[in-house]
């Protein structure tokens, strides 16, 4: 019961008028049994980021930034020890039941206050859990590896490859990426990701 994480749904109206929803798990409960040093994802250092900016300006590189959409939820949690149980309740539970009654119907119960509740084991990384960032980091580094990038030996979140006969550099912080090189190489990277 102590490892059961509450979920929270946050809605935000974007400038374009669309409503963006984000469901997160309350990973703060995990602090009692997961050490943050065992679960933290590396991030690009300020010095490395600034150094790449200097190189980009000096070489006249094309620079782009990309946000990888839905990064965590696309990351499979292979180790059962890292999977979490989440409690989905209220409107979100009702919505899931309405969308897919054949999937969730057997797993919904009503609590003492009359609120529908679903307990689910997550086989994919969930935003808000302590281990999600690290699992995504490992997956993303594997993707960069397959695309021919080589990790910088001094900076875990800076990777390089030769593309369009010139060096291409990526720096990243979890699911936010900065790439520099030839424009054609940056365009190709977007397609590859």
Regions found by a protein language model. Name each.
Residues 1-193:
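Long, low-complexity, charge-biased intrinsically disordered regions
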């Amino acid at each position: 019961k102590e490892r059961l994480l509450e979920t929270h749904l946050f809605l935000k109206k974007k400038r374009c008028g669309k409503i963006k929803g984000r469901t997160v798990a309350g990973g703060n409960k995990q602090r009692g049994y997961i050490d943050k040093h065992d679960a933290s994802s590396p991030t690009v250092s300020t010095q490395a980021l600034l150094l790449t900016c200097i190189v980009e300006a000096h070489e006249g590189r094309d620079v782009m930034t990309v946000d990888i959409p839905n990064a965590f939820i696309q990351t499979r949690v292979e180790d059962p020890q890292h999977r979490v149980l989440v409690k989905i309740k209220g409107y979100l539970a009702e919505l899931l039941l309405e969308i897919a009654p054949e999937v969730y119907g057997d797993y919904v119960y009503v609590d003492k206050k009359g609120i529908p509740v679903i307990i689910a084991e997550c086989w994919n990384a969930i935003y808000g859990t302590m281990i999600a960032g690290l699992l995504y980091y490992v997956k993303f580094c594997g993707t960069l590896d397959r695309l021919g990038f080589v990790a910088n030996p001094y900076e875990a979140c800076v990777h390089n490859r030769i593309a369009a006969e010139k060096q291409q550099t990526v720096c990243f912080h979890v699911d936010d990426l900065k790439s520099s090189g030839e424009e054609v190489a940056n365009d190709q990277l977007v397609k590859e990701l």
